[in-house]
Amino acid sequence: MATHQQTQPPSDFPALADENSQIPEATKPANEVQQATIAQDPPTSVFKNSEPIREDQIQNAIKFLSHPRVRGSPVIHRRSFLERKGLTKEEIDEAFRRVPDPPPSSQTTVTTSQDGQQAVSTVQPQAMQPVVAAPAPLIVTPQAAFLSRFRWYHAILAVGVLAASGAGTAVFIKRSLIPRFKSWVQRIMLEEETDPLKKADAKPSLAEEAVAAAKAASAAASDVARVSQEMMITKNEERKYFEDLTHLLGVQVQEMKSLSNNIRKLEGQSNNIPKIYSADQEVYNGSVTTARKPYTNGSNVDYDTRSARSASPPAAPADSSAPPHPKSYMDIMSMIQRGEKPSNIREINDMPPNPNQPLSDPRIAPKSKPWDYGQAPQDESSNGQWWQQKNPRSTDFGYETTTAARFTANQNETSTMEPAAFQRQRSWVPPQPPPVAMAEAVEAIRRPKPQAKIDQEAAASDGQSGVSDELQKITKFSESGGDGSGGIKIAEIQEETEQQHISQEGN
């Protein structure tokens, strides 16, 4: 530890020397430590990187250390401050080397005035301040002594006192203050209720208004809920009525559909009565002429053929989406509208025959008529007229009936009833029919129906047993040739048919 050498002041200032000798011993070691840290330079380390010293930072540190207030502060505080500012240890040491701390003897300065008078001024450094803080441990000692005298039973006693005081306070509030407060509130409420003037003049409070508004809102909500519930019930009833109405309408529509279907069936059955057709049937002006069906016994029974029903089911209604004519027909019609002539169509002479034209001598035998089937070929002179002879080709159509005999009887009967002019008109022989324009149509007409379609018709006719029975009766009657009770049987058939019509309409 370095020793501090005091410079002896001149003999002219004995008092100053005495004052310096009276410096407290506590401050001397501090100054000695400060000067020792400045005098002793730390040895440079071999492993430490040598960095260049920043002159500007050193100048700032010198200015900081040269400040009079900073000079009295401890060296440790000054070093830590400079380190926080970013100065290295070498720079701090260099700054302290350039600005050394003044020795303690330099704290006493002598000033000489111009007039020769001397004035002694003593500057007390800030390093003397820690000497005042020396009696601080004397203050802490009484507190430690007081704490040492505090015991655990003191804490228990304090807790007991606090608990007793709290319990007493609670009992006092419960038995004295609360009953008085309640009685005071009740008295005020009774005064307000018994005073009618105040009650009449007093305006409702916000709470009362809120309660009244809430009651009104709840009443309105209940009314709305009741009205909405009634509306829902009414709507449900209306929906039920509407569903019942739609159901009744649907039932009526179904009945109307069934009635229309029955009417169509009846119309189809009346139009599909079995008749005897051939390819050589005579057609004039779009109307087919057929004679009444006589019977071999000479009886001429005229009955309504529409009263009988056909065994075949009515034709299925055509699909509305399908075109009314095939594509080939539409193509031909479009070609005709454009003025083109189709390749497979021949022009036909459809001019009406000349009634004044004399009859030509036929070179070939006339074609047989439908009623000539079933007769043996005989000579015209011996067997009557030519239309009564049987054509050998009649078996091609599959019809072998006794209509020739019936027609003969009918001819004999009607010849006496018809006038002479009508008989002369019937004696006219029509010309030959025009050639067939579409052979495919004739072939389709003559071609028998496929077995699948026949099965479908048979299945559809199972539900029409009554109609089939009537047709069987009519067929048997026609095959028997008609006996004496023919008129009675036909009348019975007509009555049964009318009864079935009435029963279907009732359903």
From Swiss-Prot:
Gene3D superfamilies: Winged helix-like DNA-binding domain superfamily/Winged helix DNA-binding domain. GO terms for biological process: peroxisome organization; protein import into peroxisome matrix, docking; protein targeting to peroxisome. Induction: By wounding and hydrogen peroxide, but not by jasmonate. Residues 1-152 are peroxisomal. Residues 308-322 have a biased composition (Low complexity). Residues 58-65, 78-97 are annotated as: Involved in interaction with PEX5. The chain crosses the membrane at residues 153-173. It is found in: Peroxisome membrane. PANTHER family: PEROXISOMAL MEMBRANE PROTEIN PEX14 (PTHR23058:SF0). This is Peroxisomal membrane protein PEX14.
